[in-house]
C-alpha cells in the first residue's frame, strides 16, 4: 500500500509534541534500546523487496526522534541502517529506471521513510544543541548554552559521511522518473536537504573540509538535476542572516554550484535578492553577514560579479557603511581579476575601459561620508597597485587623490593614505631608467639630452627667411589657407622635397622612439612633482597625535631616500627629533625604537658582503655626514640618538677608531667640515661611554687645542665639548678630574689667553670654561689666573706709547695710518677684547655657582658615606688618623655647610673684599647703564649677558639691578641681546621665585616682539616654565594662544606642541578656556582682526575638551556671557564657541535662537 508522504510529514515531523512516538520510545527503553534497534535492523534489512513493516517503522521513528539521548554505539547503528537502506533502495531504483519500469512504489516508499528517519535524527540533535558530529570540547552552536546532561562526545563523522555519500548517489539518479510532479519531488528532496542545511548550522561541522564538501555536493546536485535553485536561494539567504559563521562558507557553496555544477542562476538570484534587502538602523549583524558573503563571492567568481555589477552598485547608496565597504572590496576583486586577464595578453600602458570605469567608481568613494569606506578604498588601491601593472597616467591620477586624503580629518584615512603613497612610490612605472631612482636633477638632465637629440633629428629649414621672422612664435601662426594657386603649389612642392630629403636621411622609427622617450621623461617628472608634493604634506604628519601615522610617515621617507627623492634628506633630518618622544605606553617606545631602526637602515647598515674595514668606513663616513649643515636642534637630537645607540653597544671599536683617524689626520689638508664632524660625533658618543674620549686624549691636545684648533675655532669649540664629556660618565655623576698642572688643563688655559677677533671666539670661550670646570680638580683657581692675566693684557700700556721716536720701523708703520684711524682701530680692538673678558667673567660666575652647588652636594654625599662607614666599623676600631678624618666630616652639620655656601654665593662672590668677581660687577653695570653712549654691540651683548648671570648669583644684586635689565630688554634694538635677556629672565624666575610676578609680565610682552626670533625664544622659554610648573598662568595664556596663528610657521608649530602637552596636565585647557577666550575675543575686536584666525584658534583649543561633564559646564559658562555681550561681534564669538561644543541644553539653544539684543 502506497505511503502518504504528506500525512507522514504532518504526523512525525511537523507535530512537535508527538505523544505516540514518546510512548513507543518509553516502551523501547524498557525493552532495551540496543535489542530493539537490532530487531529493527534485522527486520528492515530482510524486507527490502517490499515496503517496510509499519510497526517496525514506528519504533525506528521513535528512536530517531530521541536520537540525542542515545549512546554513541546506538547512534552509529541507526546511521548505518539508514545508509544501508538508501544505498540498497538507490540500487533498486537504478535497475528499475534502466528497465523502464513504471511502478516505483516500493523503493519510493522506503526512501521516503528513510528520509523521515534521517530528518528526525537531525531535528533531535538540533533541539538538544548537539549538531556537531565531530568530537570537540565545545559542541554547541555559538550563542547557546551547552546541556551537560546530553551525550556531547559522539564522534560519528565517519558514519554520517557514509550516509551523505549514499545521498549523493541517490541524488545522481533520475528522480523525476519516480516523483513525476514537482511538488512530490520537492517534498521528497526536502526530507534530505532540510537536515543538510541544519547540519551546516554547526560551526564545528562546517569547518571539516570532507564533511563540508559532501554537504555542498548534495546541494549542488539538487540544484543541477532537481530544480532546487529557488529553495536553495531562500535557505542560503536565511542562513546568512542567522548564522555568523556561514557567510564565507555560503559563498564557497555558491561558487561550487556555479563552477562545478554549471548553474549561475543560483548566484545571480542570491545577488539580486541581497541587493534589494533593506536593513533596520539597529541591525548590525545582517549587513555584516551580507558583506562578508559578497566579498568572498567576488574573490571566487569575479566574472559573475562583473555581470551583476548594476545590481551590486546599488548597495553603494546603502546607509550601512559595512555594505558600502563590501562593495568597494567587490569592485577591487573584479578589477584585480580583469588585470590578471589582461596580464595573460601583452602588457599595455593604457588602462582597459572596464578597469578604467571601475577604478573611477572606486575613486569616487574617496568622498564617502564614512572614514571606514574611504580607508577601504585606500586598502584596495594598495592591493591593485601591488600588481605588476604600469598605467602611469592612472597612477598619477590616484596619487593626486591620495594627496587630498593625506589631509583627511580621520587619522585612519591619513595613515592608509601614507601606505598607498608608499606603494605608489615603491612600484612606480619608471624603473627601467636610471636604476629606478626618482631624483629630479637626473631626470631633468636626461630630458634636456633627449630634447637636444630630438632637435638634431628635426628637418632643417631650407627656405630663406627675413631676419625679423626668425623669432616669430609659432603659436601665433594659423594653418595655411587652402587656395589652389601657383604660389601654394610651388610652396607645397618645395616642402615635399624638403620632407622627402629628411625622410631619406632620418629613419622614421628613430624619431618615434625619441618622441616616446621624451614623453616618458615628462611623465616621470610629473610623477616626481606629485611625490614631492605628497612628501611635503606627510612631513607634517611626523608629529601627529596618532602614533601609527608617525611610524608610517617615517617608513615613507625611508622609501623616498632609497628612490632618491630630492627632498627626502630634509625630512629625514626633521624625523630625527622624534627620538625625544617618550611614553609610558608601548606607543612612545615604539616611535623611539622606530626612529632608531630607520636611521640604522639609512646610515648604519653597510651594504651586504662588506668586509669589516669597509663596514666601519661606511658607518664612520655616514656618522660624520649627519653633522653637515645640521642646525643646533638637529645636532641635539642626533646627540640623543647616538648616546642611546652607544649605551646599547651598537658601534664597534673599529668605527670609533676610524673617527679618531679622520680627526687626527695631518699628512695633508682635509675638509674642515669632515674634521669638525668627526669630533662632533666623538663628543656625542662620549655621552654614552666616556672611554671614547679618553681613547684619543692625546689627539684632542695636539689637534683641537693645538695649531689646527687655533686656525679653526669651531673645531676647537667642539673639541672642548668633547673634553667636558670626560668629567661626566653616562649616569651624569663625577668621573675623572685632572690636576691643574695637567697638559690638558694648561692647554685650555692657553687657548683662552690667546687673543682673537673672530665671532666664533665667544662660543669657544664658553665651552673652554665649561671644559675646565668639568675636568680640572680646582677649576676656580685656573679661572682666577686666566681672568687676572687677561685683565693685565687688556689694561697694560699699549706698545706705541713705549716705543722710542727714533725707531725707524715704527715710524714707517705710522706713515701708513693716520693717528685718527689708528685710534679708531685701537678703540675697536680694546672693545672686542673687553667684551671677551666681560663674557668670560660672566660665564665663570655662573659656572662657579654650579661648582658651589656641586661642592655642597658632594659634601652631603661624603658625609652620608662617612656616617654609614662609621656605623659599619663601630665594632672594628680603626686607627686614630682615620677616626679623626671622619670626625672632621661628621663634625659639621649639613645646615651649617649649606648656610656657609649660601653666604658665599650671596655676599662673597659679588660683594666680598677679596672677590675677583666683585671688581667686575661695577664695570658691567656701568657698561649696561651707558649702552646708548657707545656703538660696540659685542661689548653691550657681553655686558648684558654677564649682568643677567651676575644677577643669578645674589638675590640682593638681582633686586638692585633688575630695573636696568628690563630697561635694556625693552629699549635695545639688537634682537640677539633681547633673546639673551629673555633667557636670562627665565633663569631668574628659576633662581628666585619671588620675582616671578614682576618678571613674567615682561616676558609675555616679548611674544609681541617685532622680531620673530625673539618671539620664538620667548615662547619656548615660557612654554618650558609653564610646563615645569615655574609659572602659574592666568589670562596670559590668551596671548600665547594667539601664537597659534603666527605668520612664522616655527612659532605656530611650537604653540600647537605646547597646547597639546599643556592639555594633558590636569584638564588645563578646560580650566583656563574662559580666560583664553576673553583675551582672544577682546584682542580680535580691538585690533579689528579677521575672525577666521579667532575661529581657527578656538576650534583647535576646544578639540582638547573631550569629557562630557566638561563640555556641559563650559557651555553653561559661555552661555552666561551672551547676555553680557556689548557688541554683535562679541555675541558671534560666544555663539561660535558654543557651536563647537557637542553638549548644549535646550535653554542655551533658545538663547542662541533669540539672537543678539542690544
Swiss-Prot record:
Belongs to the CND1 (condensin subunit 1) family. One of its GO terms (molecular function) is double-stranded DNA binding. This is Condensin complex subunit 1. Component of the condensin complex, which contains the cut14/smc2 and cut3/smc2 heterodimer, and three non SMC subunits that probably regulate the complex: cnd1, cnd2 and cnd3. It is found in: Nucleus; Cytoplasm; Chromosome. Residues 800-826 are annotated as: Disordered. The gene is cnd1. Keywords: Cell cycle, Cell division, Chromosome, Cytoplasm, DNA condensation, Mitosis, Nucleus. GO terms for cellular component: condensed chromosome, centromeric region; condensin complex; cytoplasm; euchromatin; kinetochore; nucleolar peripheral inclusion body; nucleolus; nucleus. Regulatory subunit of the condensin complex, a complex required for conversion of interphase chromatin into mitotic-like condense chromosomes. The condensin complex probably introduces positive supercoils into relaxed DNA in the presence of type I topoisomerases and converts nicked DNA into positive knotted forms in the presence of type II topoisomerases. The condensin complex probably also plays a role during interphase. It comes from Schizosaccharomyces pombe (strain 972 / ATCC 24843). Residues 810-826 have a biased composition (Acidic residues). Its main location: nucleus.
Amino acid at each position: 500500500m502506497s505511503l502518504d508522504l504528506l500525512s507522514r510529514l504532518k504526523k512525525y515531523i511537523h507535530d512537535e509534541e508527538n505523544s505516540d512516538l514518546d510512548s513507543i520510545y518509553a516502551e523501547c527503553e524498557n525493552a532495551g534500546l540496543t535489542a530493539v534497534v537490532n530487531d529493527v535492523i534485522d527486520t528492515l534489512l530482510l524486507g527490502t523487496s517490499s515496503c517496510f513493516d509499519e510497526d517496525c517503522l514506528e519504533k525506528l521513528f521513535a528512536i530517531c526522534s530521541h536520537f540525542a539521548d542515545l549512546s554513541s554505539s546506538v547512534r552509529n547503528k541507526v546511521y548505518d541502517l539508514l545508509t544501508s537502506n538508501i544505498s540498497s533502495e538507490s540500487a533498486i531504483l537504478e535497475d528499475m529506471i534502466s528497465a523502464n519500469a513504471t511502478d516505483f512504489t516500493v523503493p519510493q516508499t522506503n526512501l521516503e521513510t528513510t528520509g523521515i528517519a534521517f530528518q528526525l535524527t537531525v531535528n533531535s540533535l538540533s533541539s538538544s544543541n548537539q549538531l556537531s558530529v565531530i568530537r570537540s570540547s565545545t559542541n554547541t552552536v555559538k550563542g547557546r548554552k551547552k546541556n551537560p546532561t546530553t551525550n556531547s562526545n559522539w564522534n560519528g563523522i565517519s558514519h554520517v559521511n557514509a550516509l551523505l555519500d549514499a545521498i549523493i548517489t541517490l541524488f545522481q539518479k533520475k528522480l523525476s522518473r519516480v516523483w513525476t510532479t514537482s511538488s512530490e519531488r520537492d517534498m521528497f528532496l526536502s526530507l534530505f536537504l532540510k537536515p543538510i542545511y541544519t547540519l551546516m548550522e554547526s560551526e564545528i561541522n562546517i569547518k571539516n573540509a570532507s564533511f563540508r564538501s559532501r554537504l555542498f555536493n548534495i546541494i549542488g546536485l539538487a540544484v543541477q538535476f532537481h530544480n532546487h535553485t529557488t529553495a536553495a536561494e531562500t535557505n542560503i539567504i536565511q542562513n546568512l542572516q542567522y548564522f555568523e559563521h556561514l557567510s564565507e562558507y555560503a559563498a564557497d557553496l555558491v561558487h561550487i554550484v556555479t563552477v562545478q555544477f554549471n548553474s549561475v542562476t543560483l548566484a545571480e538570484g542570491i545577488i539580486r535578492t541581497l541587493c534589494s534587502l533593506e536593513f533596520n538602523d539597529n541591525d548590525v549583524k545582517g549587513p555584516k553577514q551580507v558583506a562578508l558573503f559578497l566579498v568572498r563571492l567576488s574573490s571566487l567568481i569575479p566574472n559573475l560579479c562583473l555581470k551583476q555589477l548594476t545590481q551590486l552598485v546599488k548597495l553603494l547608496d546603502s546607509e550601512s557603511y559595512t555594505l558600502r565597504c563590501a562593495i568597494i572590496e567587490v569592485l577591487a576583486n573584479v578589477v584585480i581579476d580583469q588585470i590578471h586577464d589582461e596580464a595573460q595578453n601583452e602588457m599595455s600602458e593604457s588602462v582597459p575601459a572596464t578597469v578604467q570605469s571601475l577604478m573611477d567608481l572606486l575613486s569616487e568613494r574617496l568622498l564617502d561620508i564614512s572614514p571606514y569606506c574611504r580607508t577601504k578604498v585606500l586598502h584596495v588601491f594598495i592591493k591593485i597597485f601591488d600588481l605588476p601593472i604600469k598605467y602611469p597616467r592612472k597612477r598619477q591620477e590616484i596619487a593626486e587623490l591620495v594627496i587630498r586624503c593625506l589631509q583627511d580629518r580621520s587619522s585612519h584615512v591619513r595613515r592608509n593614505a601614507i601606505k598607498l603613497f608608499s606603494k605608489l612610490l615603491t612600484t612606480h612605472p619608471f624603473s627601467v631608467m636610471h636604476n629606478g631612482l626618482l631624483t629630479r636633477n637626473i631626470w631633468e638632465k636626461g630630458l634636456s639630452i633627449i630634447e637636444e637629440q630630438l632637435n638634431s633629428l628635426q628637418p632643417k629649414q631650407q627656405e630663406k627667411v627675413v631676419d625679423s621672422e626668425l623669432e616669430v612664435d609659432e603659436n601665433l601662426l594659423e594653418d595655411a589657407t587652402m587656395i589652389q594657386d601657383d604660389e601654394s603649389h610651388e610652396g607645397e612642392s618645395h616642402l615635399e622635397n624638403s620632407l622627402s630629403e629628411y625622410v631619406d636621411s632620418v629613419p622614421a622609427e628613430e624619431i618615434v622612439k625619441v618622441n616616446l622617450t621624451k614623453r616618458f621623461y615628462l611623465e616621470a617628472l610629473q610623477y616626481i612633482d606629485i611625490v614631492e608634493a605628497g612628501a611635503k604634506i606627510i612631513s607634517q604628519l611626523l608629529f601627529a597625535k596618532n602614533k601609527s601615522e608617525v611610524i608610517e610617515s617615517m617608513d615613507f621617507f625611508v622609501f623616498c631616500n632609497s628612490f632618491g627623492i630630492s627632498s627626502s634628506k630634509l625630512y629625514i633630518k626633521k624625523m630625527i627629533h622624534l627620538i625625544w618622544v617618550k611614553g609610558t605606553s608601548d606607543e612612545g617606545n615604539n616611535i623611539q625604537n622606530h626612529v632608531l631602526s630607520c636611521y640604522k637602515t639609512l646610515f648604519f647598515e653597510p651594504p651586504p658582503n662588506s668586509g669589516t674595514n669597509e663596514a666601519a668606513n661606511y658607518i664612520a663616513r655616514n656618522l660624520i655626514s649627519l653633522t653637515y649643515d645640521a642646525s643646533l636642534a638637529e645636532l641635539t637630537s642626533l646627540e640623543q640618538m647616538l648616546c642611546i645607540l652607544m649605551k646599547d653597544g651598537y658601534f664597534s671599536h673599529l668605527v670609533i677608531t676610524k673617527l679618531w683617524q679622520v680627526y687626527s689626520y695631518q699628512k695633508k689638508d682635509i675638509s674642515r667640515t669632515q674634521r669638525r664632524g668627526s669630533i662632533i660625533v666623538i663628543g656625542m658618543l662620549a655621552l654614552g661611554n666616556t672611554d671614547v674620549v679618553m681613547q684619543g686624549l692625546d689627539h684632542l691636545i695636539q689637534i683641537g687645542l693645538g695649531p689646527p684648533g687655533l686656525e679653526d675655532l669651531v673645531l676647537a669649540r667642539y673639541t672642548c665639548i668633547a673634553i667636558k664629556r670626560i668629567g661626566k660618565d653616562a649616569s651624569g655623576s663625577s668621573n675623572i678630574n685632572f690636576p691643574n698642572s695637567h697638559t690638558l688643563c694648561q692647554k685650555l688655559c692657553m687657548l683662552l689667553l690667546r687673543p682673537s677677533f673672530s665671532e666664533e671666539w665667544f662660543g669657544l670661550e664658553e665651552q673652554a670654561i665649561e671644559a675646565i670646570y668639568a675636568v680640572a680638580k680646582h677649576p676656580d683657581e685656573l679661572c682666577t689666573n686666566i681672568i687676572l692675566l687677561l685683565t693685565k693684557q687688556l689694561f697694560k700700556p699699549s706698545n706705541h706709547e713705549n716705543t722710542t721716536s727714533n725707531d725707524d720701523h715704527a715710524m714707517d708703520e705710522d706713515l701708513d695710518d693716520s693717528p685718527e684711524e689708528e685710534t679708531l682701530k685701537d678703540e675697536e680692538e680694546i672693545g672686542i677684547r673687553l667684551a671677551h673678558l666681560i663674557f668670560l667673567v660672566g660665564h665663570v660666575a655662573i659656572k662657579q655657582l654650579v661648582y658651589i652647588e656641586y661642592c655642597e652636594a658632594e659634601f652631603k654625599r661624603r658625609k652620608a658615606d662617612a656616617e654609614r662607614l662609621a656605623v659599619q666599623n663601630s665594632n672594628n676600631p680603626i686607627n686614630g688618623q682615620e677616626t679623626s678624618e671622619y670626625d672632621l666630616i661628621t663634625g659639621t652639620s649639613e645646615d651649617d655647610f649649606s648656610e656657609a655656601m649660601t653666604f658665599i654665593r650671596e655676599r662673597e662672590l659679588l660683594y666680598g673684599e677679596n672677590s675677583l668677581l666683585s671688581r667686575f660687577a661695577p664695570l658691567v653695570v656701568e657698561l649696561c647703564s651707558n649702552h646708548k653712549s657707545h656703538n660696540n654691540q659685542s661689548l653691550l651683548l657681553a655686558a648684558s649677558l654677564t649682568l643677567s648671570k651676575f644677577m643669578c648669583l645674589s638675590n640682593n644684586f638681582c633686586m638692585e639691578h633688575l630695573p636696568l635689565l628690563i630697561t635694556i630688554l625693552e629699549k635695545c634694538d639688537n634682537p640677539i641681546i633681547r633673546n639673551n635677556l629673555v633667557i636670562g629672565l627665565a633663569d631668574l624666575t628659576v633662581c628666585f621665585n619671588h620675582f616671578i610676578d614682576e618678571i613674567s609680565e615682561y616676558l609675555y610682552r616679548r611674544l609681541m616682539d617685532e622680531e620673530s626670533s625673539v618671539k620664538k625664544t620667548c615662547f619656548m622659554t615660557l612654554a618650558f616654565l609653564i610646563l615645569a610648573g615655574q609659572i602659574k598662568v592666568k589670562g596670559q595664556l590668551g596671548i600665547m594662544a594667539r601664537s597659534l596663528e603666527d605668520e612664522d610657521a616655527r612659532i605656530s608649530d611650537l604653540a600647537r606642541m605646547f597646547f597639546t602637552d599643556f592639555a594633558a596636565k590636569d584638564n588645563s585647557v578646560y580650566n583656563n578656556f574662559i580666560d583664553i577666550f576673553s583675551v582672544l575675543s577682546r584682542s580680535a575686536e580691538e585690533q579689528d582682526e579677521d575672525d577666521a584666525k579667532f575661529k581657527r584658534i578656538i576650534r583647535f583649543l576646544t578639540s582638547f575638551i573631550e569629557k562630557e561633564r566638561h563640555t556641559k559646564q563650559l557651555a553653561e559658562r559661555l552661555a552666561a556671557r551672551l547676555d553680557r555681550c556689548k557688541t554683535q561681534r562679541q555675541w558671534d564669538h560666544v555663539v561660535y564657541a558654543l557651536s563647537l561644543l557637542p553638549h548644549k541644553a535646550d535653554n542655551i539653544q533658545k538663547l542662541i535662537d533669540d539672537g543678539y539684543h542690544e
